C-alpha cells in the first residue's frame, strides 16, 4: 500500500514538473517569435505573440515581465506617433494578458496599474459624446480610472 501511494505521488510530481516545463518552453517560444517580428518592425503581429508569452505565465519566470516591457514600449511608440487607437489597443492587450492568467493572485499588478492610467488618459482625451454637458478632462479620466481599477473577481 505504501509503495502505491509513493508511486502516485511520484507520478503527480512528474506530471506537475512536465506541465511547468511545457508552460515555460511555450512562453519562451512565443517571446522568441515576438522578438523576431519586433526586429522586423511588424509591431501588430509582435503584440499578439508578446501577449501569448504573458499568458504562458508561471511564477518565477522572467518571460512575462520581458514581454510586458516590450508591449509597454510598443504602446508608447504608438502614442509618440499620435496613433492613439493602436496605443490603446496595445495597452489593453497588456492589461488583459495579465488578467487572463489570474487565479489565486493577479500577476503583473504593476503593469495593470500603468495601463489603467494610460487607458484612462487616452479614453478621456476622446470627445465626450455621451453627456449633454461635456465633463472636464479630469472628471472623465477619473471616471474611466475608477472603472478600470474596480476589483472584479474572475468569471468562473
Predicted regions and their residues:
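Conserved small-residue packing positions in alpha-helical repeats and bundles
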Residues: 27, 34-35, 68, 72-75, ...
Amino acid at each position: 500500500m505504501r509503495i502505491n501511494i509513493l508511486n502516485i505521488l511520484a507520478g503527480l510530481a512528474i506530471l506537475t514538473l512536465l506541465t511547468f516545463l511545457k508552460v515555460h518552453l511555450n512562453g519562451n517560444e512565443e517571446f522568441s517569435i515576438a522578438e523576431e517580428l519586433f526586429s522586423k518592425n511588424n509591431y501588430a503581429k509582435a503584440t499578439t505573440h508578446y501577449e501569448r508569452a504573458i499568458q504562458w505565465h508561471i511564477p518565477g519566470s522572467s518571460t512575462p515581465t520581458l514581454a510586458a516591457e516590450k508591449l509597454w514600449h510598443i504602446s508608447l511608440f504608438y502614442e509618440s506617433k499620435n496613433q492613439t487607437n493602436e496605443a490603446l489597443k496595445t495597452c489593453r492587450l497588456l492589461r488583459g494578458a495579465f488578467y487572463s492568467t489570474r487565479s489565486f493572485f493577479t500577476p503583473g499588478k504593476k503593469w495593470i496599474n500603468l495601463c489603467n492610467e494610460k487607458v484612462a488618459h487616452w479614453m478621456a482625451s476622446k470627445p465626450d459624446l455621451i453627456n449633454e454637458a461635456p465633463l472636464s478632462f479630469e472628471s472623465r479620466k477619473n471616471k474611466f480610472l475608477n472603472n478600470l481599477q474596480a476589483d472584479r473577481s474572475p468569471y468562473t
